[in-house]
Amino acid sequence: MKSAFPLLLFAWLWISVSTAMAGPPQSVAELWADFDPRQEPLDVEVVREWKEDGGVYRYVRYRIGELKGKSAWMAAFYGFPEGAAAKLPAVMHMHGGGQRAFLEEVKTYVGRGYAALSVNWGGREMENAQPGDPNTDWGAVDPTQQNVPGYNSILPGPKQFFEDREDPRNCNWYLLTLGCRRGLTFLERQPEVDPDRIGILGHSMGGNLTMYVAGTDDRVKVAAPSVGGQGYRTEPHDMLGGLAQQERIQGDVGLFTRTLGFENYAPRIHCPVMHLSGTNDFHGWMDDVYRTNALIEGQPLRYAFSPHLNHRFIPEVAVTRPLWLDHYLKGGPALPETPRSEWELKMEDGVPVFRVTPDLGSWPVSRVDIYYSVDPDPRARFWRDAEGKKNGDAWEAKLPILDPGAPLFAFANVYHTLPKAETLPHLPEIRELCLSSMLHTATPAELAAAEVKATDSPATLIDDFTRGWHDWYRLNAENKQFWQFWTRKVTDPKWRGPEGSRLAITLTMSETNTLTLIAIENEWRSYRGKKAVYVCRREITGGSEPQTLVLEASDFLNAEDEMPLKDWSQLDQLGLCARYEENRERGQRPEPANWKGEIPEFRQIEWRPDRGN
């Protein structure tokens, strides 16, 4: 095939000269005005092809372009159902940070009747790679995680687009988006693909790329980002006790925001968007997901937030993505509408009321959870369950608070019974789908104007488990060697440990084991103090009767210097674990806990007065 090098090198030189004369682009439109993802040949290489379980799979590379005079290449996995009689819908998957192209993701969507591409933008070794296999090669630039400063910078550098001037094209995100848009070109040129039915998805940094690609390329007909892609990252956010800012930019912050801020890509998205996340995600701040997607005009939008989780989902949220893609690319059943929600702040008794009305004309409603919080930090807040009650077609709940001087946040999750059970890798059979309402927020000034009163009171009972683990999130819940159960309840002023109190945990444990308890201070709250992890290990004698473990704050020792915890006042999380290793090296697998018998049955956790009371 004839080389595209002369044309692309000329294009790069033209961009360099024109930029030097005109200055850097000042908007998203200007940033992308000179890039045509279809213009140059892809020069596709098929490294390997095989057939498996009714699918045809290829390890491929396509040419991204010539950057600074050197070829840049993207490796990827591509697959499609064997023997398809008609053109297929297609999806492009963009992996997250520290990850690589996911062959499993390709197989999952091939199994659902798609052609699927998973690009290897990070350049890590491809799955099942053989010696000598070509991989992603960015040539003279490096937007991978070998060049981490380049994500929050538009300054020049030896591995950036320009070496002599500040420009948005120096940012890694520009180059990665360019490479992924070329992936759309790869897809639309495959003979088995319907080019008018292409969707995109990505998690974390891949969620960022999903929003960037959707905001720059109208070939995208549907998008499903997760835990990433929200704007306002360069803005300081008011928290209780200080300010938090997600990103600090090297270079002109205003120029970065105008050309690379997601809030300036959202208005350019012209396709339906389903956003998946955890309510406490560190990377995709919940409040700003809603702020950003509100800028998408005239398109169907849905939200699915997993309660209490950070950077992961419950199965009922995970299933929303393939079903969303199925509807818009394959004509599958429409998902229920976003639940209608409202609240009344001004009530006669001074207690706000939240009301949510699910889409009752679609799939059956199995349950509704109404949540509220008084913590402005989306990463660290505890979401209280307001225990909504059905009233006609709506569910409603009172939102009592301790202090109207704090802000108030509320939303609801509605669970619908699926028309048929769904399966996804590594998950149990999924029979329900979770959709979130809009997020409602009120400032202290708004609460004062509505005459909201302090009607709540502190509680010493943290949990009696009559509702199971509803206020917790569980990791490896069924694995006897690696189970971990966590709650943020202890950061809420209602359940914060009183001064001098002791932590009492009542449980039943069939065999003797060492229980590990974790107390985390200032998780994500650098504006309040340094994060610290405190560990307490106690051997519990096995038996059939309940027993109570009573702990002082000083029983928890700092994982770094073994200094004791002074008090409970700055706790953000409490963990119950078979084993926990705070300082485990990246990539090292944890050692099993050598747990004997069944996972403990926890019966009650409470604060008890100190011995003097």
Predicted regions and their residues:
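Primarily recognizes the serine-hydrolase "nucleophile elbow" in alpha/beta-hydrolase
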Residues: 182-246
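Catalytic histidine neighborhood in serine/cysteine hydrolases
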Residues: 296-312
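N-terminal cap/lid segment of alpha/beta-hydrolase-fold proteins
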Residues: 37-85
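Extracellular ligand-binding interfaces
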Residues: 479-564, 570, 577-612
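Short beta-strand element of the alpha/beta-hydrolase
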Residues: 75, 86-96
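Surface beta-strand/loop "capping" patches
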Residues: 327-372, 384-394, 398, 451-456, ...
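Cap/lid segment of the alpha/beta-hydrolase catalytic domain
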Residues: 101, 107-178, 230-242
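Short beta-strand/loop motif that positions the catalytic acidic residue
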Residues: 269, 275-277
